[in-house]
Regions:
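Short, conserved turn/kink motifs that form compact alpha/beta structural patches or helix kinks used as
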Residues: 22-168
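Polar/acidic, low-complexity leader/linker segments enriched in S/T/G and N/D
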Residues: 1-20
Length: 168
């Protein structure tokens, strides 16, 4: 595909069986197309604005050595060897320096006060508090982060096989 020069980090959610909380596993994907636009809707109660993102991920992109599995198989898959694309996952434009798995609370620590991405420092392993930080709150902090709303699987096309991911 043409214009596939961007790098993204896909954060897949997987439920930790010990805690019951979502744990996010990052996958760096190189060679994708990133498009964003400001979208607005006028309603009787005022103007509603939300950025819309479209990312096209070619099947021949660099997935950092991981293989794609469908969302159902990902629930029990080894996240170090596989990734999926599903509603609710988070996509960040660029590379995030993280450990292999991060929690929703850790995700909030990846954003600097100026909105830029920073190197990740693992939290104190002896801490027992659980922060209520969610991917949605990260999206409010940085303009180049979105939550996946829909996925179109275009891998059966004769040319330019890819996944089309749309989010806000």
């Amino acid at each position: 595909m043409r214009g596939c020069t961007e790098v993204i980090t896909l954060l897949n959610a997987q439920v930790d069986p010990d805690t019951g909380y979502d744990v996010y596993t990052p996958t760096k994907i190189t060679g994708v197309s990133w498009y964003s636009m400001a979208a607005a809707t006028v309603t009787t109660s005022g103007l509603l604005a939300a950025d819309q993102y479209t990312v096209r991920i070619p099947v021949d992109a660099d997935f950092s050595g991981k293989g794609y599995v469908n969302p159902i198989a990902y629930k029990t898959a080894d996240p170090a060897k596989s990734f999926t694309i599903q509603r609710g996952d988070v996509i960040v434009r660029g590379t995030i320096d993280t450990p292999s798995r991060i929690t929703a609370a850790d995700l909030s620590r990846l954003i600097g006060s100026d909105g830029s991405y920073i190197a990740f420092t693992p939290p104190d392993p002896t801490a027992t508090t659980v922060d209520a930080i969610t991917p949605a709150s990260v999206q409010q902090t940085c303009s180049d982060v979105f939550t996946v709303l829909s996925i179109t699987d275009n891998r059966k096309a004769p040319h330019a096989q890819h996944w089309k991911v749309i989010g806000k």
